[in-house]
């Protein structure tokens, strides 16, 4: 339990320098957004090619 609290408390040091951290945070958000868009595009491509197989596999695994 003490380790968990230590990890949470250690993460707050990044907020000390807002001028440098804001730019880095914005870059990270943009990179994550780009990676998410790429992943969603890949999922769309798979669904366009194999939508029927995807649905069949999903239902067999207990999806509704």
UniProtKB/Swiss-Prot annotation:
Transmembrane segments: none
Annotated keywords: Coiled coil, Isopeptide bond, Ubl conjugation pathway
Residues found modified as Deamidated glutamine: 64
Organism: Mycobacterium sp. (strain KMS)
Gene Ontology biological-process annotations: modification-dependent protein catabolic process; proteasomal protein catabolic process; protein pupylation
Crosslinked positions (Isoglutamyl lysine isopeptide (Gln-Lys) (interchain with K-? in acceptor proteins)): 64
Function: Protein modifier that is covalently attached to lysine residues of substrate proteins, thereby targeting them for proteasomal degradation. The tagging system is termed pupylation.
Renumbered residue ranges of the record's region Disordered: 1-37
Subunit structure and binding partners: Strongly interacts with the proteasome-associated ATPase ARC through a hydrophobic interface; the interacting region of Pup lies in its C-terminal half. There is one Pup binding site per ARC hexamer ring.
Pathway participation: Protein degradation; proteasomal Pup-dependent pathway
Gene Ontology molecular-function annotations: proteasome binding; protein tag activity
Post-translational modifications reported in the UniProt record: Is modified by deamidation of its C-terminal glutamine to glutamate by the deamidase Dop, a prerequisite to the subsequent pupylation process.
Name of this chain's protein: Prokaryotic ubiquitin-like protein Pup
Segments forming a coiled coil: 24-52
Entry domain remark: The N-terminal unstructured half of Pup provides a signal required to initiate unfolding and degradation by the proteasome but is not needed for pupylation, while the C-terminal helical half of Pup interacts with ARC to target proteins to the proteasome.
Family, per entry: Belongs to the prokaryotic ubiquitin-like protein family.
Region annotated ARC ATPase binding, chain positions: 21-58
């Amino acid at each position: 339990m003490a380790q968990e609290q230590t990890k949470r408390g250690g993460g707050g040091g990044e907020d000390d320098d807002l001028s440098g951290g804001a730019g880095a945070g914005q870059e990270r958000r943009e990179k994550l957004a780009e990676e998410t868009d790429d992943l969603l595009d890949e999922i769309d491509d798979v669904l366009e090619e194999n939508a029927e197989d995807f649905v069949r596999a999903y239902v067999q695994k207990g999806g509704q």
